[in-house]
Amino acid sequence: MQCALYDAGRCRSCQWITQPIPEQLSAKTADLKNLLADFPVEEWCAPVSGPEQGFRNKAKMVVSGSVEKPLLGMLHRDGTPEDLCDCPLYPASFAPVFAALKPFIARAGLTPYNVARKRGELKYILLTESQSDGGMMLRFVLRSETKLAQLRKALPWLQEQLPQLKVITVNIQPVHMAIMEGETEIYLTEQQALAERFNDVPLWIRPQSFFQTNPAVASQLYATARDWVRQLPVKHMWDLFCGVGGFGLHCATPDMQLTGIEIAPEAIACAKQSAAELGLTRLQFQALDSTQFATAQGEVPELVLVNPPRRGIGKPLCDYLSTMAPRFIIYSSCNAQTMAKDIRELPGFRIERVQLFDMFPHTAHYEVLTLLVKQ
């Protein structure tokens, strides 16, 4: 992938950009095999990759510069700003949005937040695009509600320029820290969730719910999990750390009992909406802590699917799964190091199958799907 920002030394986020994709995949596979070297693996499936540019469905832009000439991008470690509107990881559809947002910031008088001076209002702009219909969600992260009335007043102009903006919100993040969002979300549109569709499964994206940033690879990840589950004798499963329900909604069949658990209520609202659309009545989604939910249950399903954050599932949940011993565990991980650590804590299980998904090209990161079977 050619990147003028990288070539000019202005951005180093894609540290592996000079390596061809096959070399990147080989290095990631070697890393994964090294992390799992202590465990016998029955089957290594071929790694899955997607487009090498224009694949991201989300932009997280730090807003800097002045209200008349805002910059959208990032801050270097020394505090100097860098405009990343031309980043080749973004699809071509993002460029007109960035182009319209810059004059809009001036029109609405949204002074960019200055980290050094602790002054200004507009901290971040977060943009997400649906692959199914091209609809977009735009979030303005502000320090306070001071400029909210001005923003509302100026908004019709932006909506006229960009009719693809289906969901627009303001998030209030008052803390002087590098935190992307606060707890308060104010909707400026009637529509509150962005419609998405992977493999004919309806999914919904809300402002504060996690959603994969590489749709081409994520849809293959979900489809693979579905294929693996269909090969297993499973009538009852748990989907822990379920997010908006991507895995559970793909894996569930009309006669299967499934419980999806996620701590974020926004994500659970999305999952419930999808389940209702699919007419799946035996699916339950609850906003709870996954570990607390699991360890409080007496009955054990045949399959537990886990998709934890980078820290992994942790020892308490590993201990519980070891004791209760479901027949199968499917572990989806964005951090193979913590996954390997967790598998060490599950001595009663063997690794049946492993597959790497190149969710983050040009970096050392990847997603991995692992099927564990009770010994």
UniProtKB/Swiss-Prot annotation:
[4Fe-4S] cluster binds at residues 3, 11, 14, 87. InterPro entries: 23SrRNA_MeTrfase_RlmC, MeTrfase_TrmA_AS, MeTrfase_TrmA_CS, SAM-dependent_MTases_sf, U5_MeTrfase_fam. It catalyses: uridine(747) in 23S rRNA + S-adenosyl-L-methionine = 5-methyluridine(747) in 23S rRNA + S-adenosyl-L-homocysteine + H(+). One of its GO terms (biological process) is rRNA base methylation. Its EC number is 2.1.1.189. Keywords: 4Fe-4S, Iron, Iron-sulfur, Metal-binding, Methyltransferase, rRNA processing, S-adenosyl-L-methionine, Transferase. It comes from the Bacteria. S-adenosyl-L-methionine binds at residues 212, 241, 262, 307. The active site is at 334 (nucleophile). Transmembrane segments: none annotated. Disulfide bonds: none annotated. GO terms for molecular function: 4 iron, 4 sulfur cluster binding; iron ion binding; rRNA (uridine-C5-)-methyltransferase activity. Catalyzes the formation of 5-methyl-uridine at position 747 (m5U747) in 23S rRNA. Belongs to the class I-like SAM-binding methyltransferase superfamily. RNA M5U methyltransferase family. RlmC subfamily. This is 23S rRNA (uracil(747)-C(5))-methyltransferase RlmC. The gene is rlmC.
